[in-house]
């Protein structure tokens, strides 16, 4: 796959609908905002969280970093999938604003889109955001992106962070 620019509905069709369900080992997602996105599966719309729960059922390790607590509809969908409670690894970091999806350490999307229906292009043409990003399998891009994700995950910046009082998931207590 060549590194390429993707935008709007392409983010949904190529990343959310096609590549994420093909994840085999690990899926890392970082987003500032997260909402109860619905996606097409076998001709019907289902919560994206169902897709994540199914991946976990296949042994995929999933890490999610987000910047704020999701709303009630997301929490209700989350509660429907018990695997998520036990196996979805999650960190809330109020300073996160980068958005990325890293699939098996070999494919990555990074760009402007939050993990929401409007952001990822899952909503209808006149309701989705104008978003863009890069889809790549280039190690020279994936490695620093993975390092940024992992540094937030392991709390590399927590010691000197000025927002620890707003951070319920700080990995260093």
Feature locations, PLM:
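Short solvent-exposed loop/turn micro-motifs enriched in small/polar/acidic residues
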Residues: 13, 91-95, 127
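Signature of lipid phosphatidyltransferase scaffolds
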Residues: 107-173
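Short, electropositive alpha-helical surface patch
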Residues: 77-87, 163-172
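Short His-Asn-centered micro-motif
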Residues: 7-9, 29-31, 65-68, 91-94, ...
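Short, flexible loop segments at the rims of nucleotide/cofactor-binding pockets, characterized by
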Residues: 3-8, 39-42, 85-88
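Primarily the HKD phosphodiesterase
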Residues: 19-84
């Amino acid at each position: 796959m060549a590194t390429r620019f993707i935008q709007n509905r392409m983010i949904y069709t190529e990343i959310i609908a096609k590549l994420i369900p093909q994840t085999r080992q690990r899926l890392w997602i970082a987003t500032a905002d997260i909402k109860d996105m619905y996606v097409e599966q076998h001709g019907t719309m289902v919560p994206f969280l169902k897709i994540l729960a199914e991946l976990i059922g296949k042994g995929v390790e999933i890490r999610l970093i987000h910047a704020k607590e999701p709303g009630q509809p997301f929490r209700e969908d989350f509660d429907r999938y018990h695997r998520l409670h036990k196996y979805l690894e999650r960190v809330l970091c109020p300073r996160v604003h980068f958005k990325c999806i890293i699939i098996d350490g070999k494919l990555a999307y990074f760009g402007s889109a939050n993990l929401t229906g409007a952001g990822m292009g899952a909503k209808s043409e006149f309701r989705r955001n104008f978003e863009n990003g890069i889809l790549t399998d280039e190690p020279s891009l994936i490695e620093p992106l993975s390092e940024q994700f992992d540094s937030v995950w392991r709390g590399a910046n927590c010691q000197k962070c000025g927002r620890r009082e707003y951070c319920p998931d700080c990995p260093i207590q």
